[in-house]
């Protein structure tokens, strides 16, 4: 039986793991999301200086997930990790109205990179459990997402600490990746 599912997986995705980058400004919740996806619970995190890389299995699919630090001094190095990326999870702090413009600038610059031309974009409007959180449509407009014409993208309301919205986002990502094969 296991061989049957392995052959289905191989026919859909080949034998390689899907490569996903988790990007966003510092404090957005990237590392919390990574470990919530990997172990299913919130773990204590510290600011990421450099990167974390983990293999995440979701719905029997393996993803190599790279969580890159979001501090100003680290962001220029994001491009070193773009090669062979299947999808980008872009995490935005829904409560950080002061830096939504910076988040948009970083997103736009990233999406202009040739190596990410075919990468699927999933935006996590994170910290939706907070009272002052922007709505997902407000965030989509602030980030300029409706203007993206030649890219498959979707935005999801998430709370990394509560775990809400993560399954829906990952379901969409898996289905979208499958449809590209």
Swiss-Prot record:
One Pfam family matching this protein: Arf
GO CC annotations on file: cytoplasm; cytosol; Golgi apparatus; Golgi membrane; trans-Golgi network; trans-Golgi network membrane
Residues covalently joined to lipid (N-myristoyl glycine): 2
Main localisation: Golgi
Membrane topology, record value: Peripheral membrane protein; Lipid-anchor
Keyword tags: Golgi apparatus, GTP-binding, Lipoprotein, Magnesium, Membrane, Metal-binding, Myristate, Nucleotide-binding
Keyword Transferase: no
Signal peptide limits: none
Tissue expr: Detected in heart, liver, lung and liver (at protein level). Detected in fetal heart, lung, liver and kidney. Detected in adult heart, placenta, lung, liver, skeletal muscle, kidney and pancreas.
Residues binding Mg(2+), per UniProt: 31, 48
Protein location: Golgi apparatus membrane; Golgi apparatus, trans-Golgi network membrane; Membrane
Highest rank taxon of the organism: Eukaryota
Sequence positions that bind GTP: 24-31, 45-48, 70, 126-129, 160-161
GO biological process: Golgi organization; intracellular protein transport; protein localization to Golgi apparatus; retrograde transport, endosome to Golgi; toxin metabolic process; vesicle-mediated transport
Gene Ontology molecular functions: enzyme activator activity; GTP binding; GTPase activity; metal ion binding; phospholipase D activator activity; protein domain specific binding
PANTHER family per record: ADP RIBOSYLATION FACTOR-RELATED
Self-association and partners: The GTP-bound form interacts with GOLGA1. The GTP-bound form interacts with GOLGA4 and RGPD8. The GTP-bound form directly interacts with ARFIP2. Binds to SCOC, preferentially in its GTP-bound form. May interact with UNC119. Interacts with ARFIP1; this interaction directs ARFIP1 to the trans-Golgi membranes. Interacts with ARFGEF1 (via N-terminus).
NCBIfam families: small_GTP (TIGR00231)
Similarity comment: Belongs to the small GTPase superfamily. Arf family.
Role summary: GTP-binding protein that recruits several effectors, such as golgins, arfaptins and Arf-GEFs to the trans-Golgi network, and modulates their functions at the Golgi complex. Plays thereby a role in a wide range of fundamental cellular processes, including cell polarity, innate immunity, or protein secretion mediated by arfaptins, which were shown to play a role in maintaining insulin secretion from pancreatic beta cells.
Name of the featured protein: ADP-ribosylation factor-like protein 1
